[in-house]
């Protein structure tokens, strides 16, 4: 069966132009640690794992296992997967734990197996499922951890992969907080026969995909052993991504070395500290503040648009909400 031609684009795939405000600014190589050059201990402390969650355990249990495997105090996951669901589960470690907030606007992708409760012609299945692209209204399932209020969610694309009788295998890209089980239930109602979700796997969570960075719990056990027992850090380094991976999709503002320590101490970012920034930033957007070495300094809410940040010479550009940069990586220069 030929696959439908579908453009599979999530918010995380948006390409952003970079606008330079200060073309004379440089960074001192003595300060900070470029994401790919951190000592292994810091790499782990400021890292994120692209985990292939197995079906069976809860997301919380999987995170607890990772903490035991890697001997960590803190870890957090980005987007809960139900016990029976497998696939991409970003797990942020130690000092990077709060970076999972950045994944909320990035979009998610799943491959689902829908079982119809009656026979339906293929052309009708395709036509009806196409109608579910765009904004839909959902109520969280009874067993959900959130209040069961009606809410709007966006379906970015639906791609039918295979139809075999009453079984429909499809790929779907959705906004965070979209319930695929509920989506399938409503598709079944629209088809007039009813349907239920037979299987589900998450294949993307923003910048985290089913690619060479995806690792299993067994991989982590082996790689940690290689490092601790044999002194081989190559594998654990590949298994853990720098926390900057989790903000790849966000609009960014790069700042001067002289502004880094102030933001690391919790100060809001002011316009004079900006070197370059992405086009299209709107007031209220979640933005990532970066060093000129592409280190994540903080997340915050834009208080100006890109145009205003370029044109103005003073004022608060970003209300800083979460700081990730240690206070001692860059010197106080204020």
Swiss-Prot record:
Record keyword tRNA processing present: yes
GO molecular function terms attached to this record: RNA binding; tRNA pseudouridine(55) synthase activity
Gene3D superfamilies (UniProt xref): Pseudouridine synthase, PUA domain
Keywords assigned by UniProt, alphabetized: Isomerase, tRNA processing
InterPro entries in alphabetical order: Dyskerin-like, PsdUridine_synth_cat_dom_sf, PsdUridine_synth_N, PUA, PUA-like_sf, PUA_sf, tRNA_PsdUridine_synth_B_fam, TruB_arch
Catalytic residues of the enzyme: 82
Family: Belongs to the pseudouridine synthase TruB family. Type 2 subfamily.
Role: Could be responsible for synthesis of pseudouridine from uracil-55 in the psi GC loop of transfer RNAs.
Protein name: Probable tRNA pseudouridine synthase B
The organism of origin for this protein: Pyrococcus abyssi (strain GE5 / Orsay)
